[in-house]
Design a protein with these regions (language model features):
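Conserved beta-strand in the GNAT
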Residues: 66-68, 74-82, 89-94, 214, ...
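Conserved acetyl-CoA binding element of GNAT-fold acetyltransferases
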Residues: 86-98, 235-251
Length: 325
């Protein structure tokens, strides 16, 4: 997602793009908040996202996939790429409002495209503002095409026991974690060839951002949900954010998806959180309808743009939560 209001024009700026360094993080975080807050018209733009954090968490997860743009030694923007196996997406791509429409965003997209090629990405994408033809026009120049809307949804957390058989990654003995990650990889690979959430599971565990909910039927893993919880994460105070969640496709998909949402809600209630937040692409029609029926309501919606212009895992019959922000 990129908060700019106009198509970028050719620029005579001397823009230097380089790896984002740890010493840049405070400035990059400020620019991210200021850019989004300005674009959506907040009275205090720098307060965008409150105590949630995207910049530091993503840099720590993979510093080699974070890029900085500077002009005359001044940091003016940043971009982050994320690798989920054969799936890749980028963002937040943010630029200081003083430098909008001057070619900075174009320069920040170039190293991301190179990374996707190095990674062997077969499906790449982004989430952006659905109402902005300017954003669509810019990204189309790089081969990304708009598809279905993604709804960012939330509901109050209800503290009730459902009898669902679930555990968390943090509860697993260290000796068992590699096998669990392999089982998660096998599950996601069954949804889209090469889809792999290992990096997200490990980032949440190492940075203590929340936990990964594991859904079981006996000894078979049937669902996973990578969750951020509370301040200093991508969730923010009082919130459990399901960054990724999925169950195996098939006849039991609907029932398993309901059980996975039960597990997420119970885990969040155990942490005394009050709000469950999750995104779903509306091309996953059954999952979207099921979340609405459960009481989720859309807070924000945007559009997914994909390269190549294919469905990937955004298709009917797939019970999966994510939003590519």
């Amino acid at each position: 997602m990129k908060p700019e209001s106009k198509i970028e024009e050719s620029s005579s700026l001397d823009i230097n793009v380089r790896p984002l360094q740890e010493s840049d993080l405070d400035a990059a975080d400020h620019i991210m908040r200021l850019a989004f807050g300005t674009f959506i018209g907040l009275p205090e733009p720098a307060q965008f996202m409150g105590d949630a954090d995207y910049v530091r968490t993503r840099w720590r997860a993979n510093p080699s996939a974070a890029f900085a743009a500077e002009v005359e030694g001044r940091l003016v923007g940043s971009n982050f790429a994320t690798r989920w196996g054969t799936v890749g997406f980028f963002g937040p791509l943010t630029i200081h409002p003083e430098f909008w429409d001057r070619g900075v965003g174009k320069r920040l997209m170039e190293p991301v495209g190179d990374l996707f090629a190095q990674w062997g990405t077969t499906h790449a994408g982004l989430f952006t503002f659905a109402h902005s033809q300017k954003h669509a026009g810019l990204y189309q120049k790089f081969g990304f095409w708009p598809r279905f809307l993604t709804a960012l949804m939330s509901k109050p957390i209800e503290n009730k026991s459902s009898g669902v058989e679930w555990s968390t990654f943090s509860q697993a003995p260290p000796a068992e974690r590699e096998n669990i990650i392999n089982a998660c990889r096998q599950l996601t690979d069954s949804i889209y060839k090469g889809l792999d959430l290992t990096s997200e599971i490990e980032a949440v565990a190492k940075q203590k951002l929340g936990d990964t909910v594991l859904l079981w039927k006996g000894d078979q893993l049937t669902g996973i949900a990578v969750c951020h919880c509370g301040p200093g994460t991508e969730a923010g105070s009082g919130t459990c954010y399901v960054k990724f969640g999925a169950v195996r496709s098939g006849e039991s998909g609907e029932a398993d998806f309901e059980r996975l949402l039960d597990g997420c809600e119970q885990m969040a209630a155990n942490r005394n959180l009050s709000r469950l937040f999750a995104g779903v692409n509306t091309a996953r029609h059954e999952a979207y309808r099921q979340m609405l029926a459960r009481g989720f309501r859309t807070d924000i919606q945007g559009v997914v743009m994909s390269k190549p212009n294919e469905a990937g895992y955004n298709r009917p019959g797939v019970y999966l939560i994510d939003d590519w922000r």
